[in-house]
Each structure stands twice: as structure tokens, then as C-alpha cells.
Amino acid sequence: RRQRQMCIRDSLTALRDDKNEKDFPDLKNEDTARQWIYTSPTAFCNTTDKKILSQVLNNYDQETTDFYRWSVVYSQSELAHLIHEKSGIDFGEIIDLKPIERGTSGRLVRLQIQGSKQTLIIGKELEIRRVLSPSHLYSSAFVVEREDIQNGIPQRFVIHGAGWGHGVGLCQIGAAVMGEQGYPYREILLHYFVGANIEKLY
């Protein structure tokens, strides 16, 4: 699924990244988003084909072969230190990471960090990805599982995520898969940029 952005946020339209661009779930709904993230629906970008991935990924990215669904695990101390380091805010022990708002592609645009010292809502998606990773999470389309809870404090957090990037426009992996399947370039571009006109200017 992707979001397309024209000039303002209200113009975003969600479409599936597969042959059937209709009948997709409302990923702004938390229960629906959670179910979608935990499954692996058919999509052009759902591939682990190393040949295709090598066409669009840098060498260091090729260590990962599944960008469609992924997981990251943090201990309590790792997550608390990371969030403190990246945000500059001491939340104390991290009690929960609560989804507040999702966009049409299921990506979180507002996330509540609940700590033993304070609670704060952060956003948008790029800031969420930055705060929860030493570099960046693959995307902000994720759900969080709290594990080994002792006296109300989780000792481990598992982030289950979907996709790679901000979810707007052309998906490089999906476009490469479409090309490998024989789709002409015009059809690939119009799949990702619905309503666009392709004209020769020379």
C-alpha cells in the first residue's frame, strides 16, 4: 500500500501495490492495521528475490532480504537509552509505545511514548522512525509487543513492521518486480502515479 501526495495532505489516496487495486482495508483503524501488519498479503513489493533486490538496493541494504515484513527487538535498557539519546528527553523506563494516529498506508504519524518519568506524543512518521532506531526504522507501519512485564515495566519490546520507506509514490522494489514480470514502463509509472499523463517532450 502507498500514499500519494499531491500538494496537501487531504489529497492522499491509498492503493494496494498489486494487480487488484480495489478492496483494500482501512489501515487508519488500529485493529485492521495490526491484522494487516501480522499477515503477508500479495503485493508487487512482497519479494525476497536477491536478483531483484540487488537492482534497487545499496550493498549494505542487501544484508536484509525481507523489507515487506520485519521485526526489531529491544531490551528495556536498550530502548530507554535509544529514545533518550535520539530525542534528548529522559522518559525513564519505557512503559508503552501507543499508536495515536495512522495514515492511509498504516504508517504511524503520531505515537505516544509512555515512560516512568513522563509521557509525550511524537510525530510525524520520519521522526518516529528516527527516534526508535540507531539510524531509521524501515517504516513507521508497525505494531509493538511488550514482553516479560515485571511490576508494570516491560523488559523487552518487539517491533513488528511492514514495508520500507515513507509509503508515498513509487515503490522501488515493487517497480523492479513489475519490470521483472514484464510490465512495460508506462504501466509501471501509471500504477504508482494514477491519473498522471506521460508525454514525450523532445
Functional labels for PLM-detected ranges:
Residues 1-5, 9-202:
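Conserved, single-site charged/polar hotspot
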